[in-house]
């Protein structure tokens, strides 16, 4: 008799749980459909109109080893092209270093690529002067990857999702540890299927 009395409550409990799960799934799907909120300095961030695959070109690390974006599979990657002769690059680089310090790990990394023709010696002078501690030095002296991505001005920053698809870019400098920039990066970390709804570009 006691068990019978509790059955309605059990049934309603199941309904409430299923309803909560449905609402949660709706919220997640809605966020992925609408896309990230572009506020503050990220208002000029350009969301990709189509899901473009990552470039296959390579650049070099500080030891001269060839690296491509495929190395960072399953991570959201922020790729920043910078140069020592570019004042906006110099201003924003410390904030990119702080972004890597706060979010870098299994889900996210920053790839900061110098296009200085002087290579490592020139780039390292600025890295040391700015006391950059959390970024790995990458070099693209011939600007091959920058050209493949259609870089038109410096600095330019791209974000790629976990599947290696370009989801957007920002042309010009920004404070990348600003709360709105961090929120943008976290959106792509938390919504790995966002680019699924975009047209595919070969």
Regions found by a protein language model. Give the residues of each.
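N-proximal helix/coil linker or "cap" segments that precede and/or mark the start of modular domains
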Residues: 24-56, 195-202
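A short beta-strand-turn-helix
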Residues: 56-77
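Conserved redox-active cysteine motifs that mediate thiol-disulfide chemistry
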Residues: 73, 81-98
